[in-house]
Amino acid sequence: MAKAHWHTFQVLTKRSGRLVDLAPSLSWPPNVWIGVSVENQRWVSRIDDLRKVPASIRFLSCEPLLGALDLDLQGIEWVIAGGESGHHARPMKLQWATDLRDQCLRDGVPFFFKQWGAHDKEGRRGRKKQTGRLLDGEMWNQMPNRTRVTA
């Protein structure tokens, strides 16, 4: 990945404990971003593990967003959120998405709203293209600052 410096690699895991074990043995070039999945409050502990990794960009993927989140975003450079898609998709509540966005705004963390998924903001089932990407009437496409230097 370091040799392909013109690409940005976004590596995502649910196995944050394993990530912490492996992180010291890996090189972390600035084009390798690392993230953890945080679907609901049950998985917030993954964020503490993520903070231990010396990547230039550490991010959260809150997709599918399956519950309300109360986050400490210190040391996090980006948050992605989205609803679940697929035949057995569970709906994402509007309040969960707006609360997460508001936490990002409060803490100065870029927020990217990827999709509503298989349900719209009222919880009605639809196709992803029908449910769209707007949150409170806006597209949230914020990205992290790629020039951050790790300590």
Where is each model-derived feature located?
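Core AdoMet radical
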Residues: 1-67, 77-92
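Auxiliary Fe-S-binding modules of radical SAM enzymes
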Residues: 66, 70-151
